[in-house]
Amino acid sequence: MRIHFLLFALLFLFLMPVPGNGGIINMLQKSYCKIRKGRCALLGCLPKEEQIGSCSVSGRKCCRKKK
C-alpha cells in the first residue's frame, strides 16, 4: 500500500511545472491546439484569425482562421 503513495508522489512531482519551463504542460497545450486545427503564434494572431487558447505557459497564443 505504501508503494501507491510513493508512485503518486513521484507522478505529482513529474507533472509539476518547473519555473521558466512548462515541460509536459506546454506539450499538452500545443497538442490540444493542433487538434483544434490551430497554430501556435509567437506574438499574436493575424488579422484574419481568432485566438482559441494558449500554447504555452509563457504566453504563446493558439490561433485559427475565423469561421
Curated annotation (Swiss-Prot):
Transmembrane portions of the chain: none
Keywords assigned by UniProt, alphabetized: Antibiotic, Antimicrobial, Defensin, Disulfide bond, Secreted, Signal
A Pfam family: Defensin_beta
Superkingdom as given in the UniProt entry: Eukaryota
Annotated signal sequence range: 1-22
Disulfide bond entries: C33-C62, C40-C55, C45-C63
Similarity section: Belongs to the beta-defensin family.
Task performed by this protein: Exhibits antimicrobial activity against Gram-positive and Gram-negative bacteria.
Protein name: Beta-defensin 103A
Primary gene name: DEFB103A
